[in-house]
């Protein structure tokens, strides 16, 4: 068996695997003899079916199985030994499929594999706005109006008095409308900050994907997406949505990998995961006052949560996104913009241009 590789440009590897009969013939015969020992057919005792009959019945399927095993092993070993950094997995090269496997002394298999590009990210080269959102007087008015509507008594809008103030902010000694407005503004701005932080991460991803340029083996990847979908995605779908759908997420994945490679601290550590779970589920508890037995029970619960595969994946994704969002905020060139919520929405959401109204016959008549 012999494996060779050539490059089709910088981003596509062509891998050729040559097999001769000696590479697989012994294993094929051994597998067929195992079938022979176990086979029971009418007119023959177990293990006495002629080998030629067994070969006629099972030879082709066993041959394909053993050849596929050898080719897969050779392909995987080649990727590992040569440290190929590939996207997805290799695909057979079109137009070079082997045939008539029974009657060839040597068989060649041809594969293609997309190589990951080298990406170096300098986050300081990328500028992004971050928003410090303050509640405007109009926004506070609208929120208070909503509070009054949501606390109607017998269809009567709730009055702005101490009863309502205490209902919304119990135990906080809110006695007058100005203090109430201040409290409302503080709560609004907490929500604004959380939303701005969520939006920052998504906007940062979009910006980096748009600004960090690198080539990909696009034609191969289009084919790979179709093959990997197992019939769920057509070539037409991929062609239509490739640039702004499929490849956008791939580009971010490659940029994220480059960031983690450049900054190993972004790799999740087990203790970070445990602390994250502890905060998520038990953050309201004062752990410093707990006895050892209670702490042990909490640790056992955390162990159970982390061992659950789906929960572990969800937690890892949340924590990785949180760490990366913080890293982007700290290392990109950030321009802080003071604004109100309406200004924030206009700045970060795509603005839809309304079509001009067509002049009607009635308009013309006027």
Question: Could you tell me what each predicted segment is?
Answer:
Residues 54, 71, 75, 89, ...:
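Single-stranded nucleic acid-binding proteins centered on OB/S1-type folds
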Residues 22, 116-118:
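Short coil/turn motifs at secondary-structure junctions
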Residues 78-115, 347:
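Extended, domain-scale alpha-helical bundle/helix-rich regions
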Residues 119-127:
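Contiguous, non-catalytic segments that form substrate-binding/exosite surfaces or channel walls
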Residues 2-67, 127-366:
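Extended, charged alpha-helical "arm"/coiled-coil substrate-binding scaffolds
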Residues 59, 66-83:
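Active-site helix/loop of acyl-thioester processing domains in fatty-acid/polyketide metabolism
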